[in-house]
Amino acid sequence: MVRRLREGVWLLELGLVPPFMSNAYLVDGSALDGESDGLTLVDTGLWWNEPPIADELDGVGYDPEDVDRVLVTHYDLDHVGGLNRLAPEFDGPVYVGREDLALLAGGTDPPLFHHKGLFHRASRQLSRLPDVDWRPLSEGDTVAGFTAYHTPGHNPGHLAYYHEAASTAFLGDLVWEEDGALTTPFWGDSYDMGRLRESVRGLASRMPAFDVAAMGHGDPLLAGGSDALRALAASV
């Protein structure tokens, strides 16, 4: 189901049924500031979404080939798996945190005796991603109006993205939403909860103020997003 969050920003609710659901976001830069930044998809859902991601895009009036780029918050199957459903129509670059690119490309082997490391080792073998133009991002890098913030913990290369014109922070799995507030994810889904909590505190102190908190799981907060992030940071 597609939901408009504000001018030029849409939520794409992807996956199957809870808890196998995740959020992706579509941002039309030209609708925000009149500039030709094109169409950006933030995360892509699972390899099998119901409804399919192409149908979600169609609900906003776009096709996969209209997407100019994909920004990935982190390498987990419920955030990158939908790339298989976008290809071959989508042929733009896919941006991901430098450390997570090493994970998915095999440049770094996840720790074998760690619950999430073992999961990522299995993911690389069981769910192959399409041959796309992967491009690494680091703290402070900018792409089409988005600024990347390195927020490790859930994954080593987890990124959050800030878009000033949209007054929106795309937070991935740094935080989840529960009962209208932000919370940290389940420990079993993260590499290092200590680093994750540090990332929450660090992001709350260095990201500019924003209205919309757009996370990977839960209902986006449409107002007071940065206040909600600071409230969480004060509690972890």
How would you name each of these model-derived features?
Residues 1-14, 34-36, 50, 70, ...:
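Haloarchaeal acidic low-complexity proteome signature biased toward cell-envelope/secretome components but also
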Residues 2-59, 160-177:
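Conserved beta-strand hairpin/beta-sheet module of binuclear metal-dependent hydrolase folds
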Residues 26, 34, 138-163:
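Core dinuclear metal-dependent hydrolase active-site scaffold
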Residues 40-42, 71, 94, 168-170, ...:
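Residue-level marker for buried hydrophobic side chains located in beta-strands
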Residues 46-48, 99-150, 156-231:
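Metallo-beta-lactamase
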Residues 50-96:
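Active-site metal-binding motif and surrounding structural segment of the metallo-beta-lactamase
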Residues 67, 91-98, 115-117, 170-172:
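Short hydrophobic/aromatic-enriched beta-strand-loop microsegments
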